[in-house]
Amino acid sequence: MLLPHFKKSVLALCLFPSILYAADTAPTVTLNPITVQAEGNWLDEANAQKVLNHAGARTVIQRDELINRGATSVKEALRTVPGIQAPENAGTAGSDASLSIGVRGLTSRFSPRSQVLVDGVPLSFAPYGQSQLSLAPTSLGNIESIDVVRGAGSVRFGPQNVGGIINFNSRTIPETFAGTVDLTTEIAENGHVKFSPNLFVGGTLDNGLGLALLYSGVNGEGFRDKNDDSDINDIRLKAAYAIDEYAKIEANLHRYDADVDMPGGLTPAQFAENPYQSLRNHDYMKGHRTDGSVKYSYKKDDNAFELLAYHTDTFRDAGMERSGSKLYQTAPRNYKVTAIEPRYSHAYQLGTTENEVSVGYRYLHETSEEAVNRASYNTVTGPTNEYAWTKADGKTDAHALFIDNRTDVGAWSLIPGVRFEKIKTTENMYKLNKDASVLNGVHTEKSYDAVLPSFSVMYKANDLWNIFANYGKSFAPLQYSQMANTNASGAYLTMQGLQPEKANNYEIGTHYLDPYLSLEFTLFYIDFSDELKRDDATQTYSNLGATEHKGAEFGFKYNLGAISDELSGISLYANTTYTKATASAGENKGQDLDFYSQLVGNAGIDYKIDQWTLNTNFYGQSGQTASGTHDATGRYGNIPGYGLVGIRASYDFSNTQLNGLKVGFGVKNLFDREYYTRSADQVGGMYVGAPQTYYLQTSFDF
């Protein structure tokens, strides 16, 4: 039984500061009164100081950094974070509406192993039953900062957190009326143009009510010759009301719509002929999401309380030709999620120690409705005579409880914690006749109870430098798609023999922060047992057995003003990650995993003089492999490494007749380096990367 072990864990956690106090044999001294302050939810108001005080690997990127680096998508923004790999669009993940990121060698397709949030609300359709981002309902233009917690976060946020927590913070409501209108225009080598318009306007009234309207879009053609259009609209309405100086209520209402083409992969012969062509004229991804959230927060002295409630309603559909057949397939899906999350933190003193205990609970209910339809297909007329193939419905009820306690003893901080997950998932899968009547069906359900301990320790060498180490256990339930499937004969169960994913994460590292230099260095090790591996060609899963991921991350930002005031306009940044990700059991033991680079890095220089800002940046990654029997489709084989250089110049018209106007011009892939990736899924093939691309940024603040 897991529950008795859970009770023992909680009891030990609660007694932990008392044990430290009892063990303190130092002489009694008179101390000045100390005011303890509860921190509460440490995802709130993420900044460099919070990174310094976090006992794990963590990186926060602010909006101005993203602009200076010329990032025009969330994928490009995340590439600047140590440990993250964000591949080019490929396969069924081949659209601007999807998001694929892999952390520390973990699989990147649709970001399945990181808990991705927007303002604390899960971004995925269904956090437990379908934790993927084939539709990622967020846009870079509406983001204030990106907070990437790679270690020491699993106890508070889960499941699906072996790859850490990524929280996109939307733009904050200004204290006074203000707004920005901006437009980024990208021009590809083939003359195709893509526009990214953004609007932000808001302010706070004298009575404490704040309102803001955010809009971000992507409209136009990509760099492929055909079937590469994007039409994305992302709008968010935010409200906040300060009840008094300690309490406030915040609300979000959000709508996201996307209709994007997927140009598809090429065989090696087609790629050699023209890597930018598209021979799949009817593949697409479309969808929409409506969501709302309300949060009440209270913080006064030693107490902090937060209550978050949210509801999401997501629809997505993808249509694509099935390679090697004369069939076309669509996959409409609907998901609804409702959740409530109370959290409470209390700071207290016990003898010479300062403590903060935090407890939280979440109840989440999600439902799914999934279907697959097929049609006859040829490349000229497209799909015709659509008929039903399968349908499925599922639901999950999940309870999660966490408790952790931070104890500060001199220069040391000790943070034990435990998370308890109780999950029940059901799935009904039906094979349909062409007229949508049921041929046969199967029903399955699975329940999970998991106790997930964590422990972090941090040593404060001084006010600028911390050293940390941590351990955390993560857990991921089976997804709806892993529980049952169909073939031409009927529906059948696929979960026999499959085990939930479990992983042990270890880190040791350091943070440094002063007015001129910020630095991070982390050694990591992930012991991933019972990792589920997807066979993209057959769309089935198996327990690979185990994988291990180990490596090192290093990053810094440095302002040369530390050397001389005359150099204060020059800033440098760089980060690099070395990862070794291998199978540690089974027939592939010792072999590298697919679709990850052992070495990834980026660097840049920012130079500001008067009203000019000049930027240059570099991104590079080593080669990858897509293991499998080489064939004419291009699915399998080596993927060469590459490096890309970008430049940008901008001018701020402040203190002129055009006050508020900013204009920037840049070039991505300056030397027009040709590179590619592969996809081993049902679409498959080779995918060329973005060629030399020019972009123009214009914005006006009012």
For the regions a protein language model found, what residue spans apply to each?
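Structural signature of Gram-negative outer-membrane beta-barrels, strongest in the C-terminal barrel
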Residues: 244-246, 253, 347-366, 392-527, ...
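Short acidic/polar hinge/loop motifs at secondary-structure boundaries
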Residues: 121-150, 237
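Extracytoplasmic beta-strand/coil segments of soluble accessory domains associated
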Residues: 43, 50, 75, 79-122
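N-terminal periplasmic accessory domains that precede
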Residues: 74-77, 100-105, 114-119, 133-139, ...
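Outer-membrane beta-barrel domain signature, especially the mid-to-C-terminal portions
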Residues: 318-320, 390, 429, 438-446, ...
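Transmembrane beta-barrel wall of Gram-negative outer-membrane proteins
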Residues: 180, 191-263, 284-295, 346, ...
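Membrane-embedded beta-barrel scaffold of Gram-negative outer-membrane proteins
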Residues: 199, 295-300, 304-320, 460, ...
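Gram-negative outer-membrane beta-barrel transporters
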Residues: 344-347, 351-354, 408-414, 422-423, ...
